[in-house]
Amino acid sequence: MTCLFPRALGSLALLMVVLLVQGELHVKPGGQHREDGTALQLAKRRYKREWVKFAKPCREREDNSRRNPIAKITSDFQKNQKITYRISGVGIDQPPFGIFVVDPNNGDINITAIVDREETPSFLITCRALNALGQDVERPLILTVKILDVNDNPPIFSQTIFKGEIEENSASNSLVMILNATDADEPNHMNSKIAFKIVSQEPAGMSMFLISRNTGEVRTLTSSLDREQISSYHLVVSGADNDGTGLSTQCECSIKIKDVNDNFPVLRESQYSARIEENTLNAELLRFQVTDWDEEYTDNWLAVYFFTSGNEGNWFEIETDPRTNEGILKVVKALDYEQVQSMQFSIAVRNKAEFHQSVISQYRVQSTPVTIQVIDVREGISFRPPSKTFTVQRGVSTNKLVGYILGTYQATDEDTGKAASSVRYVLGRNDGGLLVIDSKTAQIKFVKNIDRDSTFIVNKTISAEVLAIDENTGKTSTGTIYVEVPSFNENCPSVVLEKKDICTSSPSVTLSVRTLDRGKYTGPYTVSLEEQPLKLPVMWTITTLNATSALLQAQQQVSPGVYNVPVIVKDNQDGLCDTPESLTLTVCQCDDRSMCRAPIPSREPNTYGESSWRLGPAAIGLILLGLLMLLLAPLLLLTCDCGSGPIGGAATGGFIPVPDGSEGTIHQWGIEGAQPEDKEITNICVPPVTTNGADFMESSEVCTNTYAGGTMVEGASGMEMITKLGGATGATAALGPCSLGYSGTMRTRHSTGGTLKDYAAPVNMTFLGSYFSQKSLAYAEEEDEREVNDCLLIYDDEGEDAAPHSPTLSSCSIFGDDLDDNFLDSLGPKFKKLAEICLGIDDEAKQAKPGPKDSGSGADTCARSMEVPQSGSNRYQTLPGSLEVTQTGSKICHTLSGNQETSVMSTSGSVHPAVAIPDPLQLGNYLLTETYSTSGSFAQPTTVTFDPHVTQNVTVTERVICPLPSASSSIVAPTELRGSYNMLYTKETCSHL
């Protein structure tokens, strides 16, 4: 046990040694390695020293052959074998050739020629040792042969003459120039070290300069250089090598003294004076001479003249003559003797260049007085002010400038100070011919529009010259006008509507402003309506919403149609477009979805603003046709017979005069008061008549209007049924003497939506009085409890408290409710008589009742009409002649129109009451009212033809107003009525009015 421990310890130590050895063999060194990675140990070889000796130095420009051999080469291999020595390089096999040679057997190198160091400072010789096979046994060596320098080259200056300059009054030790010289000898050697010195100075005298020995810098020695005394210096400088003891060379230096502004200019005179006529200009009134000692024709010598006082009105200018340095006094603004007789001002002078710092503190402004005497002369005309600026008003387009008046620019009489007379104005310079001036009033206006590409516009301004020529003296005065024109907006913003159609219930729409050039013409935009030339009511308004939109809305209720709304848009630079933009807007009736119910017709009656239109071929043709008709009208008038009678009647031989006393009312003519008024009786309505349960007009009222030659029946719907009368052949017997040869009747009916034009005619007031009296009695007898308010009230106003269904005369009064009857108080006897006739108190009129007369040459007018329903239907039978057939007790009214004198008779009263005859089949009790007119109307007599099934119980009442002898008072029953029974004829003839 005791020996195991030592054994184990020894084995462990042996193992560690093996591991250490194995680890050393595999360490990777930084040197060479085998393929297995182990280090390769190289044996170190000891080399011998160089096999050539150093060469001896050679001196230039000497014979160095006595020093041969200058070098020797020897190889250790020559002991064992034959060695051959060879050399090569510059001076051997390169130029210069043959300077060095070698002995091939022993290796001695010899020099054979004189060398120059400046050409070849040193020689490099390549030495080789070769065996018998011509192989190098030694590594080739380089042998250096140095050439020693000798002082054989003098210094050389870079220039023969050096030129320099320096300002006068410069401080001492100021650098003037640096001289440059070189030496070809060995650098950094005494042979090439140069020393400089000044040999001489011209002009001689006090030395003004010095030079640095080593650097060659020439500097000032003093600060007293003065160009005005000596303007340049000439120096001779030498340079010697070997630090001044060797070879030397000389050069020249030319130094110019530069001028500085160290001399003040001084005027030669202490004061100046001159004379000049008023209102004249002078380019050279005076010359000022100045003395300056600085260099001529330089800024230091050139004088600058200026005013120190007295030229506040800028009447004078001083210009310097560059050749003589004199100041030239010019009169650039005319002097007025009436304002100033003498001008005093002061001038001073300085140089164009600033004064030198050495004397600037000594400068003082010296003012010299100048007096100008103004000579009085007879003055002419001039423009005051000499220029005038006009501005085109904002909003005026550049293409609407023709005729635009800018204003006037008149010349002034200098003697009176007022506008000159006997002056003719013309335009001198007028680029583009845009303007024109009135030769008498000097009014200026545009005659051409401005093009945006015009080259005559400079900074938005047009300039022109105005000449005023005195017609007495021939003198001319010139003035300049400037016209500021509106700016052009080449990128006008456009206005876009949110929608084209709007509703009448909400007439508004949003406008949006857009532009293509976003970089220049940006918002905010201002949208406004174009100002209307006429004083029209404002229909639209614009309210700004934001920078690019606005609200267009109607200010009042608008009707459907198409509207053109011109608007003006301003950009952010307040620029306007040349023309306003017109927006087309359609206003329509909308449904619940705010959509137009029906399209708006293409016609635009409600166009707002200006609309473009043109004449078509049809319109042009109509215009030409109208002109042709105007030319033919005089020819047609020559063929007209103005005295012919009415249609269908005999000629009367001329116009029938209106007889006196035929008027039935009192009119206010021009000599009595205001304009005549229409006093005809309004419509008297007839209530519906019922026969066998059938209404005539189906719950509508029937109103009759009597016109010349026809009867009109009005319904509640506003339509008029017109019955016209005409002659027919082959008819039955005539009715009375009014037939005048007619034997039949023809009935024509049609309806129209309007009314015929009424012609005012006088009314027989006597008949109306009796009629209304009888009607009042009839109402009183029919219904006792009914209030009697339908009596003869010519000027009465029944008021608004009448019963709704009670008959009134408010609508049948021949006078208006607001008629003032005070004018009756001033009427004469003639009108008093007429008033008695109208009131029914004229006894003479009642007693004068002439008998009926036969038909004469005059034309009787019989306007009879009768509407009788046929049994079993609601058809009507018309009896020509304005015959009113109504039910007994019903309301009757007859409207009088046209050129007729008409009267109406009712069934009640004391005249001829209607007789009711019962009829078992149809409703009887009819009243036939016949009306005659004999005032000259040309209505034709008619024949009454009854239907075979007409009512048999008829009461016929006849009343004739017969102011003419041709009126007839008899009635002849037609053929159909002669066999009838229960027929009552009543005749009443009125007296002449």
UniProtKB/Swiss-Prot annotation:
Segments of this protein annotated with the region Disordered: 845-876
Glycosylated residues, chain numbering: N110, N180, N459, N546
Membrane topology reported for the UniProt record: Single-pass type I membrane protein
CDD domains tied to this protein: Cadherin_repeat
Transmembrane region(s): 618-638
Keywords: Calcium, Cell adhesion, Cell junction, Cell membrane, Cleavage on pair of basic residues, Cytoplasm, Glycoprotein, Membrane, Metal-binding, Repeat, Signal, Tight junction, Transmembrane, Transmembrane helix
UniProt GO cellular component terms: adherens junction; bicellular tight junction; cytoplasm; desmosome; plasma membrane; spot adherens junction; tight junction
Single GO MF annotation: calcium ion binding
Disruption phenotype: Knockout mice are born at the expected Mendelian rate with no observed differences in prenatal development. Decrease in body weight and overall body fat is first evident at 8-10 days of age, weight difference becomes significant following start of solid food at 15-20 days of age. Oral mucosa show a spectrum of lesions, including inflammatory erosions that prevent the mice effectively feeding.
Extent of the signal sequence: 1-23
Topology Cytoplasmic: residue spans: 639-993
Tissue: Expressed in the basal layer of the outer root sheath of the telogen hair club, specifically at the cell membrane between the apex of the cells and the surrounding hair club (at protein level). Expression is less abundant between the lateral margins of the outer root sheath basal cells (at protein level). Expressed in epidermis. Expressed in the epithelium of the tongue.
Top-rank taxon: Eukaryota
GO biological process: actin filament organization; cell adhesion; desmosome assembly; homophilic cell adhesion via plasma membrane adhesion molecules; negative regulation of cell migration; negative regulation of p38MAPK cascade; positive regulation of bicellular tight junction assembly; positive regulation of protein localization to adherens junction
General function of this protein: A component of desmosome cell-cell junctions which are required for positive regulation of cellular adhesion. Required for adherens and desmosome junction assembly in response to mechanical force in keratinocytes. Required for desmosome-mediated cell-cell adhesion of cells surrounding the telogen hair club and the basal layer of the outer root sheath epithelium, consequently is essential for the anchoring of telogen hairs in the hair follicle.
Record's protein name: Desmoglein-3
